[in-house]
Each structure stands twice: as C-alpha cells, then as structure tokens.
Amino acid sequence: MNSGFHLLDYLVLIVYLGGMVGLGVYFARRENSTERFFLGNRSMPWWAVGISIFATQLSAITYISIPGKAYETDWAWLVYNMGIPVVGLIVIFLFLPAYRARNITSVYEFLENRFGPAVRAYGALAFIFMQLGRVAIVLYLPSLVLFEVTGLPLELMILVMGVLVTVYTVLGGIEVVIWTDVVQTVILLAGAVLALFLICFRIDGGFYEVISIGGLHDKFQMVHLDTSVSKDLIWFILIGAIFTNLVPYASDQTVVQRYFTTKSGRDARRCLWLSVLIVIPSSLLFFFLGTALFAFYTTHPGLLQEGVGNDRIFPFFIVKEMPVGLAGLLIAAIFAGTMSSLDSSLNSISTVCVTDFYKRFFYPHSGDRRCLALARWITVIVGIIATALAVMVARSLMGGSGQNGGAHGAWDLFIAVQGLLGGGLAGIFCAGVFTRRTNQIGVAVGLILSAGLLAAVKYGFQWHPQTFAAMGILVSFIVSYLVSCISKTVPET
C-alpha cells in the first residue's frame, strides 16, 4: 500500500514529461513548412496515424471517467463505444472518398466547395468553439489527479499541464503530435492493464471474484428497460453512439486532418480501420477496470474515504494503493491520455485559423514562412486560452469545495458539449456528401433550427445528452435539404 506520492513516482512522471518535450525538440528541426507542420508532408505511416486517431478520441476522460462510470453504475455506456466501428464503416465508404478527392488541408474547405465561403467560415468557427470546450475538460481531469497526489493548488497543476503540452506542440507540429500519440497510447493501455492486474491480485479470489461481485451487483448490465428520456437507456446510447461519434470522425478537423497526413486513399482507409477496431478491446479494458475497482472497495470498505466521487475513484486508488514507482507510471498514463487529445486540438485549431481564415479571407498570397510562424503563435495563444478555460471548468465541477459537483461529472459534460455544438455542423457535412441540391439558404435555415431545437431540449426538457447529436444532425440535414428544394439558389459544385 502506498500512502502518497514518493520521490521515485515524481522521477517517473518527470522522465515521461521530459521525454514528450524532447520529441518536440527533435521534430522542431524538421518543421520548415506549413505542409509539414499541418500534414507531415502527407507521408506519415498509416499505422501510426491510426493509433493517433484512437489516442485523440481516447483522452483522460476515458482513463478516469469511464472506469468511474462503470464503478458507479454498470456497463450500459459500453454500447456507446461499440458504435464507433459502425461509424468507421460509414466514414470509410461515404465521407473519406469525398474528402480525399480534394487536395485540401482543412475539412472545412469541403464546405466552401459545396456551399460557399460563409458556410466554410461558420464550420471553422464552430469547430474552434467546440474544441475549446473539449480541451478545457480533458485538461481539467489530469490536473485533478495531480491535485489529489500533491495537494498543490489545482489551478497551478492546470498551468503546468497546459504549458508543457503547448511547448512540444509548438515545436513539432503534427509529426510530434502523431508520434507522441503512439507513445502515449502504449503507456496508457499498459498502465490500465497493470492497474487491473494489481487490483485482481489484491482481491481474494482474484479475477473470478471480480466477476462474481460484479454479477451479484448487476455491474455488467447493459440494457435498462425504462421510459425516461433522462436515463442511461440502451435506446439513447445506441442512437447517440452512431450520431455522436459521426461528429468527430466525419466533421472534426482533429480527426479528419489525420486522413490527409497519409500517402494515399488506401492508407487513409487502413488508418481509420485500425483506429476504430482498437476501440473494442480498450473499451472492455476500461469498463472492466471500473468493475474491478468496485469489487476491490466492496471487499476492502475501510480503504475508501467518504466523499470520493466517481470521477476520482481511479486516481484515489492509484495514490493510496499502488506501489511506489508504479503510482508514478499510472499518473504518467493519465497525463498521456490528456496530452494525446490536447496536442491534437492545439495543432488542428492552428491549422484551421491559418487555412480557413488567414489565408482564405485576409492574406491569400502570404508566404509560407510567415504562415508557419503564425501557426506557432496561434498554438501558443490557444494553449493559454485552453488553460484558462480549464480553470473555469475545474471551479465549476469541483463546486468550489474540492469535491466533485455531479454524479455523472466530466464525461456527461463532454458528451453534451460535443452534441450541442457539433450536431448541426455534422448534419451540413452529411448534406454536402449525400445530396447535390442542398444550398446556402437551406444550410442557414437548417443550422438555425437545429441550434434552436437543441437549446430548447437542453434547457427546457432535460433530455439525455446522447440525444443532442442525433437531433442536431437530423434536423440540420433534413431541414437544409427540404428548404433547398423550394429555394432558387443554385448550389456550389
């Protein structure tokens, strides 16, 4: 049993963080153009890109909140991740050919090709705001872990994380983002496996006792027969699994940008297949980890302190129960989760700002060297903004008292942010790929009605967060197409 963080734990964590910055320094010597900074010269290995896509979507939310969710409730949310391979199939055969057929850097260039520059600008802005909300949450979670470990102010921990990620992303561009994602994925998954092994070792009866306790308390239940629109029903989770995951895989620059870093369309398909197939074993691992934590504290009730919320149960176990040295490795794994998402967001926001705004609307003939310098400065600015927003999220979720303020915590907030801001935008991408008659007027009306409906549902009816993306995509897609059919504006081709 470990009563706290020791010198060896700090050394392990420092070596990991230093290694990530070292990779940034190494790749900084090669980042001499925007083509390399944004796309890795379109020559990245498909398997590394696939792991990077997986890591980008993984985040510390998966590492902390999903085990916490399984600990608190059951496996109902496993269905959500099982829908990702279905989304991968849709994107590979329908969206990817449309994107790869165009020699583009930003996915929002596709929107201009179909609907004009105004829609492109809207899509890019919506992406930026959605990512800022997302990075605030994924930066908050690992900083919470450091708060638990060291007792230092939470805001200081957020600052440390924000600075380190910003530094290596500024230095190395998309290449360092992809290769650090590979390293971070290995560390993160290895850490989860190690934690699960040690939990089972500490329980009399081991793995089979975890199964027994989990079954006795219905922890493996995946289907809830209920009619409430606010519960974790399989109906809402199944619907949300398809539509919510369609948002990042079809319309989010952090993911779609990876498709453009590969050498060919074949490699793009292979990287996407790899990224979605890894989801299945990793999801089973993280949900079982949460059930194992429940079994551990059921058999060792005296070790659980009062007031430890579901979002903090895994970090609490790491700090209190992991052997010296291994605790540092597990904390490094949590850092890997957040850094793999945060670096992707910083680089992609920089890509969008330069490609979709600076070069498109302000200085189209600006030299590549100036654009590269601007991209780095934007990365710094976005890193500062993300850090400030993470402080605000921490104060909100912690309720100002150091305790988690909600039963569902950061995971549900993340889903709500993605559904509310991304659903309507993804619907417009669907209209661009699946129809030819949709035009600018239809897009505008569809986006307005979609946003209005989502706001009403979110603040007026308190429906399940999993319904947000589905409603946003369907309303945006259907309304934009129907309005276009009765309008006289000729769509862009």
Regions found by a protein language model. Give the residues of each.
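Membrane-embedded helix-loop-helix hairpins and adjacent transmembrane boundary segments
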Residues: 1-493
